Design a protein with these regions (language model features):
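S-adenosyl-L-methionine
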Residues: 50-85
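Conserved class I S-adenosyl-L-methionine
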Residues: 6-15, 33-36
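A short SAM/SAH-binding and catalytic strip from SAM-dependent methyltransferases
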Residues: 93-106
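Conserved beta-strand signature within the Rossmann-like core of class I S-adenosyl-L-methionine
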Residues: 121-130
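A short glycine-rich, Lys/Arg-flanked "PGG" loop and its adjoining helix->strand segment in the class I
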Residues: 108-120
């Protein structure tokens, strides 16, 4: 779902950035933008329907150190604190949010932002328990993984082409 033509990635709630390191090991010289929160919630919450949008499990300084130690250069890393920074307005090739957007954070809170930072062919990869809902939002919705026998009972989907 990711090719060598993809150069600009937005990760929402990626934690320390391990997936982005794996992507960079295969396709080097990409640019990564991370939208994160810079604190650890007192109580860890798991489950769908995080409408309040107040959870976080990250330390942005440690995230940057981890990415640097594991081979990402400073010019590849752009970390944005959701609570204090203006979010990036670049157009991205791929947007990834695994078990975050739609899991901890309500997808509807981000629709307008995602439209603003998406190209016509941007692929958005995230997890959901209601994949059919997204056929009303995107022209293309494909289930790429199902975890129906897990606690999360989720489907990972890849979407592109906003309808409106």
């Amino acid at each position: 779902y990711i090719t060598s033509n993809d150069k600009s990635f937005l990760s929402i709630g990626s934690g320390i950035g391990g997936l982005e390191l794996i992507i960079n090991n295969k396709f080097e010289n990409n640019t990564y933008y991370f939208i994160e929160r810079n604190y650890v919630s007192k109580k860890v919450k798991y489950g769908w329907g995080g409408v309040v949008n107040d959870e976080a499990y990250n330390n942005l300084r440690l995230q940057k150190e981890f990415l640097n130690i594991n081979g990402l250069r400073d010019d590849q890393i752009n970390i944005f604190d959701f609570d204090s920074d203006k979010l990036p307005e670049n157009k991205f090739d791929v947007i990834i949010s695994l078990l975050s957007l739609g899991y901890h954070y309500d997808f509807s809170l981000y629709i307008e932002y995602l439209k603003k930072v998406s190209k016509t062919n941007t692929r958005i990869i995230f997890d959901t328990i209601n994949s059919s809902y997204f056929t009303k939002i995107f022209k293309n919705v494909e289930i790429i993984k199902s975890d129906l026998n897990t606690v999360h009972k989720s489907k990972r989907i890849i979407c592109s082409g906003f309808i409106n």
